[in-house]
Swiss-Prot record:
Homohexamer. Organized in a ring with a central cavity. SUPFAM superfamilies: P-loop containing nucleoside triphosphate hydrolases, PUA domain-like, Ribosomal protein S5 domain 2-like. It is an enzyme of class 3 (hydrolase). This is Lon protease. One of its GO terms (molecular function) is sequence-specific DNA binding.
Amino acid sequence: MAHTDTDDLVGLLDADDQNLDIPATLPMLPVRDVVVFTHMIIPLFVGRDKSVRAVDAAMAKDRFLFLATQMDGAVENPESDQIFKHGTAARILRVLKLPDGRVKVLVQGLAKAKIVRYTKKSDMFRVRIELLHEEDLGDLDMETEALMRNVKESCEKILGLRGELTPDVTMVLDGIDHPGRLADLVASNLNLKIEEAQSIFETIDPVQRLLAVNGFVSREVELSAMQARIQSSVRDEISKSQKDYFLREQMRAINRELGEMDEKTQEIKEYQDKIRKAKMPKEAKEEAERQLKRLEQMHPEAGEAPTVRTYLDWLVEVPWKKATKDTLDIKKAKEILEEDHYGLEKVKDRILEYLAVRKLNPKMKGPILCFVGPPGVGKTSLGKSIARAMGRKFYRLSLGGIRDEAEIRGHRRTYIGALPGRIIQGLKHCKSNNPVFMMDEIDKIGADFRGDPSSALLEALDPEQNFAFSDHYLNVPFDLSSVMFITTANMTDTIPSALLDRMEVINLAGYTENEKVLIAQQYLVPRQVKENGLKPEDITISGNALLKMATEYTSESGLRNLEREIGTLCRKVSRKIAEGKKGPYQITASSLVKYLGLEKFLPEMDQEEPQIGLATGLAWTHWGGEALYIETTLMRGKGELVLTGQLGEVMQESARAALSYARTNEDELEIDPDLFDNFDIHIHVPAGAIPKDGPSAGIAMTTALVSALTERPVANDIAMTGEVTIRGRVLPIGGLREKSLGALRAGIKTIIIPEKNKKELSEVPQQVRRKLKYITVSHVNEVLEKALLPAEKKKAPPKKKPPKKAAKPKAKKTQPKAKTTEAADK
């Protein structure tokens, strides 16, 4: 029930009805957020102009006023249809004008009435009313008396729960003997919505009105009881906390008397010991002690205490001064590297050089290497071998798909669940501040609205800055200069230049077939035999079988698919032995079909014959070197150049440069000039779903274009790579070693390369150079002379104006299905 001054409540009930003569037409005062019941005395604050005029009009005459409630209290100037029809005829008892211009009016409800009509009065509301009289109930029946008693008891219960029940209120309630008066009294003091209070007010029958009030009183009893329970629970909780605190303080006092430490004191002492043993730098130690002091002043159950504890745990567990001792025996390190990996001499020499310098200069900073090469050549496993050779711990962090800078630098401690970045986590895992830290797939880092992780790596991978690497979580510098960082990538194109500049790039090219056979015999076969539960004597795979697997069952620069095929052989043999069949099993080249099925790859040049408009280029992709086929055909049109196969801008420009060269030298190349005006030229690079770009397909495009225009076929055993200019000059390219391996896998015997790439032939393995013939050129004319075969039959030039129903141009030979490749090199 709403709070009501006891004097007002008693005055309300003691007021006599006095048979006052209430006029039929009264000024009306719209009231907000309250329903004024009969016999109710209530102060009203009046501030609206119309309302003030209505009060003035009532005071000027007989003080009678009609009070009606607005349907929406937020409406400042309500219309007649926004005011309830039923209201109270009231009399003004007192008026007080306030300094702010408002008027405080004390009114008493006299009788219920309803609006008959509004009289015309623009400056205020004036209404004609009809008084509503309740019927005389006479003697009350038992049911009504029981209802009244129930309502009174409920009211006393509510006031009792709230601590507001007084003898005066009890006396007032006991003195009411009319159900209508009781209903009005209780309803006026309940926290009811305007619609609920108005519904009770408009109920004329006193018993029905009391029944409605009884329902709301019952609801209020439940709410008051629930509120009392909540308050009691809160008080109990507070009492328990106070009791716990008191007992805890007593326990501390007892422990101090006995010379023993409590749990919190013990925790603080443990952290102090850990901070001392961690041998932190000065700045980190000061931060740790400051946080420990905060923890000491906190209540053990404080919400921030776990966050501070977690931070201190990280500070004391990070290896500030813990380091493994390097194995500086260069001979032993070389043996370990040779034991784990075949070839890769450049990388092994670089590691041994570092160990030699480290032996002479123990304070040398760790190198930052970047291994670049196709998948499966051993970049990741090489990192493990380097760690083993140096006697260091190894940690691998995969950067592929990371888009959040916080993965590198960590989250600030203000965030819930914050942790240090992956670099600090890795060092804690290794328990050493000088591990071999491999960051895999650095070329596949992403970036989004959360930041750019590659930019966060700039500090970590810069030897001039990483001695004071700042992790957002630790918020104190950490020295990374002793860490040997190794990154891996398939290509350097997507690595930001600023990051690439901080790393020493070492290219790991693909393996030759002979190298694959040797690696398979020394490493892959023994490993798969062991993993599949076999003994070395159970299975023997011949060298020819391994060579056939490398050339006809796989086509890759690395070794992953070859190892999978070897694993397939071992599993099939394991099954036979498990079924009780006796071995040993000899796997030869001729028996591979029985175990692995038909060959999956065939040398592509074995399936083709020289064709017009088809030239073979060489591409350098993430997966190594590949053959790249370029198809050109002519069709009647208006001399347009059509390019398809998802060619990038550089390749499109190469095609236009090739066309410009052909048009400029049409006489020398014996090209009919009418072809450029009456025929469209379509250049297509198969595997259209894969984007391709790069300048090194220039001479291949020129060769295919000239072949189609002169109808001279292109030799099918020649591949070519080189950039072309509109003057016909052939410019150098990159990735010669990888492209040579790709040509060899494709069955190509001859490669045309730019003259300026001749010096790079020394990097191509000797066994590859023996199987390939290299032709160096400096001009496109030399390329065409070597690649184009004589025309089979001289063709008559097409007419300028073909007839309306002209026959289609003579169909070229069926173009071969090109092997899927990605893009020409940069």
